[in-house]
Curated annotation (Swiss-Prot), chains A, B, C, D, E, F:
Listed cofactors: Mg(2+)
EC number per UniProt: 2.7.7.3
Keywords on record: ATP-binding, Coenzyme A biosynthesis, Cytoplasm, Magnesium, Nucleotide-binding, Nucleotidyltransferase, Transferase
CDD domains per the UniProt record, alphabetical: PPAT
UniProt subcellular location: Cytoplasm
Species, as recorded: Prochlorococcus marinus (strain MIT 9211)
One term of GO molecular function: pantetheine-phosphate adenylyltransferase activity
Cellular component annotations (GO), alphabetically ordered: cytoplasm
Pathway where it operates: Cofactor biosynthesis; coenzyme A biosynthesis; CoA from (R)-pantothenate: step 4/5
Residues annotated for ATP binding in this entry: 8-9, 16, 87-89, 97, 122-128
Protein name: Phosphopantetheine adenylyltransferase
Length: 157, 157, 157, 157, 157, 157
C-alpha cells in the first residue's frame, strides 16, 4: 500500500523519521509530501527541507519525497496514495489532528487518515521545540538527523 | 430570556448557526454580538460578517445581530441580556472557554456563561478550518451557509 | 424557566449547592432530581440524600427536590422542565458530560443540556473526594453542607 | 493487508460497525477478535456477541469473526495479521488507547496499532452508554444493529 | 529535604523506581509510604509490597519504606516530611492528581504536592497495565523490577 | 534549596505571586528569571517587568529577581539553582509544560522541573487574559498586584 505523509517538516525531526520507517515497513511505500504554505514563512526553504528529508531517508526502501500546494486529499489522489498517515504524540494536539482527519473525510470519503502512536521517547519532540533549543544554542543531536542539526546550528549562529 | 452570543464569526459556520437556532428555541431571544477587535485583522470586514449573519438568520424568530467593542459582560448588560451563550465542541478549546467564563464571572457576578454542546457532526468545524479548506479550493458548502461559501470562494479565487 | 438538575448527590457538596443557587437565580426554578440507580450501592440511602438536599436548600426560592428512575430526558418531560442543567468542573470528566448530553439529545431533541462552569475554588471537589477524606477522618466542613458533614462523620466513625 | 480489530464488543455498536466497514475497504481483511476476559462479567455471553457480530457483518467482504484469550499481539501473530486496528473517538479515552498501543509495541515491535478517527456522529457512542440507555428503556436503534437492539431490549425487559 | 511519596505500589513499576531515584537525588530523603486501603483488595499483600520496594531500593541512599492508613497529609506530618511527591505521566490522570493535590492543601496548607514529570519512555506504564500483561503471560521485565516480575509471574501461573 | 522560576511575566499576575510565596516557603530561595526573548514583542519592557516583580516581592524573604537569555537549564546552572519551578493550572497547557520539562531534562539530566498546582481560584488566570480585560477597560485588581494594575491601565488608556 502507498501512504501519503503530509507535513511542513520545518525541520524534519527524529520523531518524523521514526514514523517514516514504521510507515514504510507497515505499508511498503510512503510519499513524504512537504506542504508549501504561502501564508507561512518557514525557517528552511522548501528546497532545503526536501534535501534534508532525502538525505535522512536515502537508506529507507519505499520512500518518495515531494512538495505540494492545496488540499492534502487532492494531492493524495494525484499520487495514487491509499491513505494519509499521521503521527499521534501523547503530547500532541490530538484534537487538532482529529479535526483535520474529519475535515479531510468530508472532502473525500475515500481518504482515511491513519494514525500511528509516536514512540514514547519522541513524544515530547516537535519542530518548534527543536528550533527554540537551537536558537538558544542548545544540544539538538538527539532530536534531529545530523544534516538538519548542522544546518540549524549554522542558521542560528 | 435573552441570550448574548458573542464571537468573531469570521466567518459564520453551520455549527454557529445550529447553536443560534437551538439558543432561540431554548431562550426565545439571541443577540448575536460580533466582536470588533482592533488587534486582529479579520478575513471579512465587520459589515460583511453582519450582513452574512443577517442573511443566514432571517428566517429565525428572536434573533438580533449587532457588533460591539470592549468587555462582553458590559455589552451583555447594555443589551439587557440574561446570560452569555457559548458552544462547546468535543474538539474545542474547552480550557480556554472555561477560562473566559471564569474571567467574565469575576468581572460581573450576574453574568453566567451557559454552554451548549455543539452537534456531534459539527464538532470538527471551526472558522479557521473553513478558511484553510477554502484557501486551497476545497468544497465548503457542508460547512457554511450558502452566501458565506460564495463570498469565501470569491475571496480566495 | 424550569431546569432539571439530575445526579446521584451521594452526598451533596458545596459545589452542587453553588450550582443550584446559580441555576435558580438564572432560570427561576430548579428541580433537583436524585437518580435512583438499582445497579449502584450508594453511601447514603435515597431518603437520606433527599433529606440532606431539602435541608441545605430550604432557604433557596424555586427549588424542588425529588427522585427518579429511568431516563433523564423522560423524567425532564414528566416534570415539564425546559432544560437539563449540569456543572462543568475544570477537573471534571468533560468528555463523559458531552457524551451524556449528546446521548440525551438523540433520545429527545427537545431537551438541551445546559452547562455552567463550576466556581474555580470548587473545581477540585467531587462526592468521591469528600467520602475519601471523611473515611480517613479528614476535615470536610469546607466541602459539604453542615448536615452532610455530620452524617458523613457518623457513618465513618 | 489483514487487520486485527480486538475488543469486548459488549455489545457491538454502529460505531464499531462503521470502523469494520472502513477497515475492510482500506486493508481488505479485518479479523474481529472478541476478547474473552475471565476477570469481567459481560452483559452478553461470548457466543451471543460472536453471533451478533456475524449477523451484522454478513454483507461485508473480508470479515472474519473469532474470540481469543491472552495477549492481543500474540493472537495477532497467530492470525497472521499485519496490524492492530482501533478507533479513536473525540470523546474516547485517548490516553488509555495510546497506553495500550505503546504497551503492545514493547511486547512485539512488529505489531503497530493503527488508529482511525471514529465518524463524528458516532463519537458520543460507546457500549456502556448503549447499555445504560437500554437499561432505562430508551430508544437504541440509532446506536446498535437491529439484532443487538432486540436482544438488549429482551435482556432489560 | 524529606519528601513523602505515597501510593499503593500494587506493584512497584520501573516508573515508580525512576521517580524514587530522582526524588532522592533532588531532595535527599524519600519516604515511600504504601497506602493500606481497607476498601480495596490489592493483588499483593501490604507485606509483599513493602518487601518488593525494600528489595528494589536497597542501593538507593535516603530511602525509607513504610505503610500508612488515613490521610496522606497527616502521615506526612507524622513523618516530618517537607512535601508530598507525585509523578505526572503524559498519559496519567492529570486531573485526578490536581484534584488530590488541591484537596490535600485544603486539609493542611503546609503540605505542598510537588510533581515531577515521569520519564517519557515510562509514560505509558502503570501498575494496572503491568498486571494485565502479566495476567496474559506477557513479558514484563522491561516494566518492573526483577523480584516483582518473578512474583507476578508466579501469581498468574 | 534554590529554585529557578523562569517566565516572561508579561505582566506578573497574582497567580505567579502565589507560586513565588509558596516556592520560597518550600525551598527557601526562589530566583525569578525573566526571559528576554528577542523574537517576541512584550507589552512591558524587561526593565518595567523586573521593577514590577521587585515591587511585588519586596516583603518576601529569599527572592532574587533577574533576567536571562538562552537556555533555562544553562541559566539555572549559572545561578547554582537546584531545580526549575513551574506552576500547573488546571486550565494551563499541561502538555506544553511536560514537553518543555522533558526537553530540559534531555539537555541537562541534573535539572528537574518541579511543578506546583496553582491555587484553584487562580486557575483561570494568565497574563494574556489580564491584558485582554485591561485592554477593554475591565477591572483587574483581583488579578494582578497593585503597581501592575496601575501601569496596565495607563498603557491601555
Amino acid at each position: 500500500m502507498k501512504a501519503l505523509y503530509p507535513g511542513s517538516f520545518d525541520p524534519l525531526t527524529l520523531g518524523h523519521l521514526d514514523l517514516i520507517k514504521r510507515g514504510c515497513s507497515l505499508f511498503g511505500e510512503v510519499v513524504i509530501a512537504v506542504l508549501e504554505n504561502p501564508t507561512k514563512s518557514p525557517t528552511f526553504s522548501l528546497e532545503s527541507r526536501i534535501a534534508q528529508i532525502k538525505d535522512a531517508t536515502k537508506e529507507i526502501r519505499g520512500v518518495e519525497v515531494c512538495s505540494f500546494k492545496g488540499l492534502t486529499v487532492e494531492f493524495a489522489k494525484r499520487k495514487n496514495a491509499d491513505l494519509i498517515l499521521r503521527g499521534l504524540r501523547a503530547m500532541s494536539d490530538f484534537e487538532y489532528e482529529l479535526q483535520i482527519a474529519h475535515t479531510n473525510r468530508t472532502l473525500n470519503q475515500n481518504y482515511e487518515t491513519v494514525f500511528l502512536a509516536t514512540e514514547a521517547h519522541f513524544s515530547f519532540l516537535s519542530s518548534s521545540v527543536v528550533k527554540e533549543v537551537a536558537a538558544f544554542g542548545g544540544e539538538i543531536n538527539h532530536m534531529v538527523p545530523e544534516r538538519v542539526a548542522t544546518e540549524l546550528q549554522q542558521k542560528f549562529k
